[in-house]
Curated annotation (Swiss-Prot):
Catalytic activity: a purine D-ribonucleoside + phosphate = a purine nucleobase + alpha-D-ribose 1-phosphate; adenosine + phosphate = alpha-D-ribose 1-phosphate + adenine; cytidine + phosphate = cytosine + alpha-D-ribose 1-phosphate; guanosine + phosphate = alpha-D-ribose 1-phosphate + guanine
Domain of life: Bacteria
Molecular function in Gene Ontology: guanosine phosphorylase activity; purine-nucleoside phosphorylase activity; thymidine phosphorylase activity; uridine phosphorylase activity
Organism: Polaromonas sp. (strain JS666 / ATCC BAA-500)
Protein name: Pyrimidine/purine nucleoside phosphorylase
EC number: 2.4.2.1, 2.4.2.2
InterPro entries: Ppnp, RmlC-like_jellyroll, RmlC_Cupin_sf
GO cellular component: cytosol
Function: Catalyzes the phosphorolysis of diverse nucleosides, yielding D-ribose 1-phosphate and the respective free bases. Can use uridine, adenosine, guanosine, cytidine, thymidine, inosine and xanthosine as substrates. Also catalyzes the reverse reactions.
UniProt gene name: ppnP
Family listed: Belongs to the nucleoside phosphorylase PpnP family.
Keywords: Glycosyltransferase, Transferase
């Protein structure tokens, strides 16, 4: 199931812009204090570092990801999720000529 709408949240209006604009996200906070981010990654290959564990939920487009210590790229498309451990690195790539990867990042 794809998350299409999120109700009852507070949105940080200033965007987080990474990698010269190849990744742009906004922080959201739920009434219970839970924090997530929603964003988009344009065609590129990027490396991220995590603090807390993350679940990346694809809501549109697709990407390939590679967790630290792995040589394999794994595809993630709309409606799919993948988990990244805390205090880890992972690579994510969106192929040129394809739709941007739209995501919700669930922390913790």
């Amino acid at each position: 199931m794809i998350t299409e709408k999120i109700d009852n949240i507070s949105v940080t209006t200033k965007a987080n812009v990474y990698f010269d604009g190849k990744c742009v996200s906004h922080g959201i906070t739920f009434t219970d204090g839970t924090k997530k981010s929603v964003g988009v990654i344009l065609p590129a290959t990027l490396t991220f570092n995590t603090g807390a564990p993350e679940i990346m939920e694809c809501v549109a487009g697709a990407c390939e990801y590679r967790l630290a210590g792995s040589d394999s790229w794994v595809k993630s498309a709309a409606g799919e999720k993948f988990s990244v451990p805390g205090n880890a690195k992972f690579d994510i790539r969106v192929a040129e000529g394809f739709e941007a990867y739209h995501y919700i990042c669930h922390f913790g």
